[in-house]
Each structure stands twice: as C-alpha cells, then as structure tokens.
Amino acid sequence: MAGAVDTSKGLPSHPERATLEGKNKFLGFWFFLGGETILFATFFGTFLGLRGGTADGPTSADLVALDLVFIMTMLLLTSSLTSVLAMFAMKKNNFKAMMIWMWITVVLGLAFLGFEIYEFHHYVVDYQFGFSTSAFASAFYSLVGLHGAHVAFGLSWIIVLLIRYRKSGITLTNAPKFYVAGLYWHFIDVVWVFIFTVVYLMGVGG
C-alpha cells in the first residue's frame, strides 16, 4: 500500500503507472473509454438518422444560437486546459496550484452545465421543443443530454477527489485517480467537439 509521497523528491514522472494497481486501473480505464466511445457513436448514428424527422416542428436552423454554443464550447475547452495545468502542477509538487487549477476546472464545468440547462429551457419554453415533439427532438435531447450527464458525473468525481486530497494528501494510490479523472474530462471535451460539429454546425448549415 503506497504511503504519502515525499514532496521533496516529488512524484514519479508517471504516477498513474508507478504501482501495479495504478497500471491496472489506468489500463482498465482505457477499456472503459472504449465502451463509452461505442455508446456515443451509437447515439451519434441515431441522431444523424433521425435529424430530418422534425414532424413539422423546429429544426436545428430554427433553434441554434451559435454564439451561445460557442461560449459553451470555449468554457469546456478551457476547462480541459486547466485540468492539464493541474496535472503539471502536481508533477512539480505544487499541490496548492494543482488544487486551484482543478477548482477552476470545476467552475468552468459548472458554467457549461448552467448554459446547457438554459439552452434546454429556452428551447422548451420559447419553441415548444420538448423531448417528444419529434424524432429529431428525442435524438437531440438524448445525445446532448447524455453528454451533459457525463459532464455532471465528471464534475462530481473531481470534487470528491479534491476533498479527499484536502484531507489525506496525494499518495501513489490516489495520484493515478487524478490522472484518470483528467483523462475522463478530456474525453468529455472531445465528445463535445463532435457534438458542436455534428449537431450544431451541421444543423445550422442544413
């Protein structure tokens, strides 16, 4: 069982693989992300197949405000950068900076979710665009909502880790968990780039 890391010597260059347990968790998580990729690919395929089924209701071109979606995209991409900076800080034994960058990541993620909730509310109230309005609506809310649920889970995960660090410090046992959480967060960001392109840009372009 790994104890607290001697910060005078620093963490190993790859703390996520410094122990056998860490290696197994890291490898297992890559398999998990593979399954997540298949899940999202299925939802993307369903959306592409149903996006024309508007049932005379609103289309993407009617709904989407690219300025709002662009702000959401920048928030999420910036949060990916701050999570990277947090990991760099941890490797340099600057755990205070790591905490700051991770909390900034959380704030940016929460802001993204806030805008997404506002977006959904706007569509429902102003356009009567509910989940059951059309096949397109169901596919839209399923795909974008699935991603939003992943963002919420990722934020919860990071917050739990930050609280655990505050109480117990970084160890060779929990350091890999920060790396895995960061990897998960980057995956969420990549998925959003595809959503931004396929759902919003292609939707506005017809």
Swiss-Prot record:
Transmembrane segment boundaries? 26-46, 68-88, 97-117, 143-163, 185-205
The keyword Translocase is assigned to this record = yes
User: In Gene Ontology terms, what is a biological process of this protein?
Assistant: aerobic electron transport chain
* PROSITE patterns the UniProt entry points to: COX3 (PS50253)
The protein's name = Cytochrome c oxidase subunit 3
Asked if the Swiss-Prot or TrEMBL record annotates the protein with the keyword Cell inner membrane, the reply is no
Q: What Enzyme Commission number(s) appear in the record?
A: 7.1.1.9
Q: What is the lineage of its organism?
A: Bacteria, Bacillati, Bacillota, Bacilli, Bacillales
SUPFAM superfamilies, alphabetically? Cytochrome c oxidase subunit III-like
Question: What PANTHER family does the record point to?
Answer: CYTOCHROME C OXIDASE SUBUNIT 3, CYTOCHROME C OXIDASE SUBUNIT III
| Subcellular locations according to the entry | Cell membrane
* GO molecular function terms listed in the Swiss-Prot or TrEMBL record: cytochrome-c oxidase activity
This protein's species is Alkalihalophilus pseudofirmus (strain ATCC BAA-2126 / JCM 17055 / OF4)
Q: What is its main location?
A: membrane
